[in-house]
Amino acid sequence: MKATAKAHPIQGIVKYHGMRDEELRLPYHDSISVCTAPSHSKTTAAFDPELDADEYVIDGEAVEGRGAERIAAVVDHVRELAGIDHRVRFESANSFPTNIGFGSSASGFAAAAMALVEAAGLDMTRPEVSTVARRGSCSAARAVTGGFSHLKNGMNDADCRSERIETELEDELRVVAGMVPSYKETEAAHEEAAASHMFENRMAHIHGQIAEARDAIAGGEFDRTFELAEHDSLSLAATTMTGPAGWVYWQPRTIEIFNAVRELRAADVPVYFSVDTGASVYVNTTAEYVDRVEETVADCGVDTRVWEVGGPARILDDSEALF
């Protein structure tokens, strides 16, 4: 009863903040994202009747507190679905920096859900596995189905699940990651956004935003898709930063990258910025222009990586297990 899985993190296109049901992690509205590769999380999980307690390790460190509670929510749900009560040994490793705004919880919980479901002997489709991953992170649901994916809002697992959007953009997109160090806490951001006086205004337009994004992505419209993602980043930030704590999570280098992107665009380069929760920046462009864009972002004084569109979460061979 052991399995290993791999999943890619996500960049939000139409993002979400705020949870209608925190236990089931049901969001207030739909969301759309794209997976970024080769960045990934790998997880090995084994249900073992000889263990006295669950063991959770991420990047070589034992997980405790709220992090352990979130993993346990996924583990316990899999136990319930499989009708087993064995304790689990769980180990995960990330190939990219975590907690700086690049979707590590998405890839982590997506890989965890895939590995746990396989280790428990369950036969589930990826949309079904996405409902398991959602118990740890809504973004993880979209990382399970990969590529450009749409998590639909709903009242339960029958309808709140992820589906992939087929698009020609998967071959064209290149993402330059501008890494701006600044620890972030997504759960706090959910609470801040929902308490903002601007949250109702965001809810009023988000459904039209989702419909427009789906149409642009399905039609392979690069500029329309990522202009929308850029605007949505600003909308999300405005909502989150006007919560009770007045939390400003951007750093000076974040703004510098924004301005550099707009200068490139004024020079007819197809390029748009996007941010989730954190100071780091996704800079979306095409294969033709990626070298020029990366050089410009690096000139802002940050480390960079270049990513492509990542596929769905998948089971790996036993030879790749972490233990």
Question: At which residue positions do the language-model features occur?
Answer:
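ATP-binding N-lobe of GHMP and related small-molecule kinases
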Residues: 1-100, 117-124, 296, 308-323
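Short beta-strand segments
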Residues: 6-7, 35, 177-181, 274-276
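Short beta-strand scaffold segments in enzyme catalytic cores
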Residues: 11-15, 33-34, 41-46, 140-143, ...
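Solvent-exposed alpha-helices and their adjacent loops that cap or buttress functional pockets
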Residues: 24-25, 34-37, 141-143, 166-172, ...
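Short beta-strand-to-loop capping motifs
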Residues: 47, 60, 180, 283-287
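Gly/Ser-rich oxyanion-binding loop with an adjacent helix/lid
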Residues: 80-168
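ATP-dependent small-molecule kinase catalytic core of the GHMP/sugar-kinase superfamily
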Residues: 131-251, 255-269, 288-300, 306-323
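Short cationic amphipathic helices and targeting signals
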Residues: 273, 278-285
